[in-house]
Structures are given as structure tokens and as C-alpha cells.
Amino acid sequence: MAKRSKAYEAAAAKIDAEKSYAPFEAVTLAKDTNPSKFDATIEVAFRLGVDPRKADQMVRGTVNLPHGTGKTARVLVFATGDKAEAAIAAGADFVGSDDLIEKIAGGWTDFDAAVATPDLMGKVGRLGKVLGPRNLMPNPKTGTVTPDVTKAVNDIKGGKIDFRVDKHSNLHFIIGKVSFDAVKLAENYAAALEEVLRLKPSASKGRYIQKATVATTFGPGISVDPNVTKVLTEA
């Protein structure tokens, strides 16, 4: 295991490893214990009580964070004709069809989200082995397979995030930057948590959210009490 930096060790010393913090308290502590000198990203991880190998226990969705992520997403749109022009006008970073499909088939994935018009999904679907593992495959359930490319691009640029449980039953997503006000971070966390709870599969038995953790990019993990869903602005 790599040796932790002194800054990391100092940050970890401020955290009670035996305690599960309220959301506001956790994000405040994450801000205070950021060991990096740059404006680090704050991420959340949930361990879910589901078996993602079973189709009826897959958790996948989207959430519009009320305060965005602090990151401007690079959006790729598979479209032609008027839809391509609309995507460009909406601010998409990459727009095309066969040219982009060929480039991605060669291994290029230098973008954060992908949108496709329904008529092109027959071709885009062949990119599953490249886009699927990176959670970049357009999907009707997340609003990224749609004729309304303008709305899709605006939503993603405005702070919409996609999430999907991985093979280890974990969900990961960004809730903002260290520079964000703690209340805004807590409100973003609450919005994401609410959507994850709404998507609980009926086949999931027992405790649904088994563990919740907040951490900065290179900072220590901070346990969050998943039973606290309201934004409490007092520790």
C-alpha cells in the first residue's frame, strides 16, 4: 500500500472513524480536511443492499443537482441534420455520427456524457464494449436517447448526473467542489440521496443503503449517516 502523505494523515486525524456524521457536518468536515492545494472535487459513495447481477435489482438513474457539480461536462451528441445543428447551438462539445462512432470504436472517450437521437442508436449500440464500462452509453432511462437534444445538452451542462450501481453494489457521484458553500453541498447530497431512495428496487431486502461516504479527491473518507435525509445546517 502506498504511504499516505503527511497532509492526508493530518486530515484523517480530524475525523472520528467510529462516527457517522450528518450530511452537513460531513461535507463541512470534507472541506476542512481537504489535503490538496487545488479546488478538489467532493464525491459520495453509497454501498447498496442489492445484487446488481440480477436485473430486478439494478439501480440506475439521473438527478439534477440544485447547485451543479462545479464541473462543466464535455457532452458528445450523436446526431445528423437539424438535430446536429440544435446540439451545436445548445453547446455540445462534439457532434457527429459515423465519424464519431469510428473514433470511439478506436478507443477515444475524451468526454463526460453522450447523447444520441433514437434513429442512430442502431449504430451507437455497437459501441457498447467501449461506452458501457465507462457509463457513457446513451440510454432512454437517463434521457440521453432523445430527439430533444437541446434539453439533454442543457440538462447535462446544468448539473445533471447519471449514476449506476457497479458490480460491487456501489454508487459513485460528484456533489460539488471544496469551494462550494457547505449548505449547497449538503443540498446536492440530499437531492442525490432522495433519488437513490426513490429508485430502491422492490426485490431489495433488508437495509438498502448500507454505507455512505463523503470524500475529496485525495482526502480521507467520512462516514455519513444514511438515515439523515434532511439538510441540517448545524453540526
Curated annotation (Swiss-Prot):
Pfam families: Ribosomal_L1. CDD domains: Ribosomal_L1 (cd00403). Keywords: Repressor, Ribonucleoprotein, Ribosomal protein, RNA-binding, rRNA-binding, Translation regulation, tRNA-binding. GO terms for molecular function: rRNA binding; structural constituent of ribosome; tRNA binding. Gene3D superfamilies: 3.30.190.20, 3.40.50.790. GO terms for cellular component: large ribosomal subunit. GO terms for biological process: regulation of translation; translation. Belongs to the universal ribosomal protein uL1 family. Binds directly to 23S rRNA. The L1 stalk is quite mobile in the ribosome, and is involved in E site tRNA release. Protein L1 is also a translational repressor protein, it controls the translation of the L11 operon by binding to its mRNA. PANTHER family: 54S RIBOSOMAL PROTEIN L1, MITOCHONDRIAL, LARGE RIBOSOMAL SUBUNIT PROTEIN UL1M. Part of the 50S ribosomal subunit. NCBIfam families: rplA_bact. This is Large ribosomal subunit protein uL1.
